[in-house]
Amino acid sequence: MTARNVLTSPTRAAECGAICAVAGQSQRGMREWAEAYPRLFAPKPFDAALYSTLSLAMAFSGPWFTAGQLRMANKATLWAFGLDWLVDYVATSPREAEDIARRCLEVAEGGSPLPGDDLTRMLADIRDELGASPAFPVLGPVWRAELRRMLEAMLRETRWKAAKAGPTFEEYLDNADNLGFSFVFFSHWLYVAGPDVADPATVAEAGRAVQRVIRLLNDLGTYERDVTWGDLNVLLLGVPRAEVERRLAGLAARSRELIAPLRAGSPELAGYLERQMDFCAGFYQVGDYWGGL
């Protein structure tokens, strides 16, 4: 199909319209969460475009899902952005970041959130919603493990930044859990799954492969912001852009290989993973989710 046909196809336009309508419903939910947990979402970085683009990312990645089915994908994503903001920009030392991680892990294990702590209060609400899923006996422990992996990766990055000693390219890729994609993906899967689920280890391998792809796509697309905000970025580690792009192509191909076996038994999971990767490939060529400092 030519570009002209794509742009003028009424079927494709109708599909995009339906997807955008779901995203609009989801965006309203995000704004309600931002109002419910006001200490977590500073107005400048969490601007209107952030809520809009995040909800569009989820809707286009799973166009077969309703806004209700995408509720947890959106809620966990927004929470992870709030966590990232606190760890990367609000915390003034690795010790403060470690305290944030400790509080989150305690709540994930069933503890009560601290009074006035919107981060753990929102996490407790996420935990309780997920606890009602029929898949929780199987995927609940995996969800907690994914949260721990994300927090540990975030803390590792804070230590790198504090020591002013950047990691190697391989160490950086191995730390891609700090992106939060796998945590959000498992939150979504747990929320929509029934009692019979695919093998978590197989799904996790595919999800982490996609996460590494999105990590590099993010870095290539947000280099200027990362320089301004003082973030780590693979291009700031002395890795040439051409080398990053070459590695990215290989990682994307490997991701598709790992996704392929999931299609027979879990077509929605497989499709969601691949579409997330492809959505980000287009999105980061043009924009970024964050607002301003």
What are these regions (language model features)?
Residues 1-293:
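Alpha-helical, largely C-terminal catalytic domains
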